[in-house]
Curated annotation (Swiss-Prot):
It is an enzyme of class 5 (isomerase). SUPFAM superfamilies: Ribose/Galactose isomerase RpiB/AlsB. GO terms for molecular function: galactose-6-phosphate isomerase activity; ribose-5-phosphate isomerase activity. It comes from Streptococcus mutans serotype c (strain ATCC 700610 / UA159). This is Galactose-6-phosphate isomerase subunit LacB. Pathway: Carbohydrate metabolism; D-galactose 6-phosphate degradation; D-tagatose 6-phosphate from D-galactose 6-phosphate: step 1/1. It catalyses: aldehydo-D-galactose 6-phosphate = keto-D-tagatose 6-phosphate. Belongs to the LacAB/RpiB family. Its EC number is 5.3.1.26.
Length: 171
């Protein structure tokens, strides 16, 4: 099974430890970045994880930023992706078993590393339990998706990166 992982610069160290853990558990890891602590934008990596899962390049995905909020929202914008921002085992299992979530997101600065590993392991092993009600709920979620051709452009974030490089954004 191949797991796509991605993060922003705030939690690169946590992502690298998760990558090592997943490999030790026997999973193939597709690391879409970021790879260092140079300031970057979480939507880039949420989108990359989402696209890897949506295209079938990866079976499941894990996203992380400081709080998990931004990157989970970015991943959820990719058609075919159902991302759950979780901080506990119950939410992670519910998202996979009932809503067939295919990406799980975390606040790497919020949740402890060992709990994160346990949740990711359980999320990967959990099985979707299809029921008529679950199928209807997922169909309603899928109906909300609208394909945006601009979003598929690999240069979608270039404008924002140029602004960052000019110093238009400040922490």
């Amino acid at each position: 099974m191949k797991i796509a992982i991605g993060c922003d610069h705030i939690v690169t160290d946590v992502k690298m430890e998760l990558s090592k853990h997943l490999k030790e558990e026997g999973y193939e890891v597709l690391d879409v970045g970021t790879y260092d602590f140079t300031r970057t934008h979480y939507p880039i990596f949420g989108k990359k994880v989402g696209e890897a899962v949506s295209s079938g390049e990866a079976d499941l995905g894990v996203c992380m930023c400081g709080t998990g909020v931004g990157i989970s929202n970015a991943a959820n914008k990719v058609p075919g992706v159902r991302t759950a921002l979780v901080r506990d085992m119950t939410s992670a299992l519910y998202s996979k078993e009932e809503l067939n979530a295919n990406v799980v997101s975390f606040g790497g600065a919020i949740i402890g590393k060992l709990l994160l590993f346990d949740i990711v392991d359980a999320f990967i092993k959990a099985q979707y339990k299809p029921t008529e009600e679950n199928k209807k709920l997922i169909a309603k979620i899928k109906h909300l998706e609208a394909h945006n051709d601009k979003q598929a452009d690999p240069h979608f974030f270039d404008e924002f990166l140029e602004k960052w490089n000019r110093g238009d954004y400040h922490d």
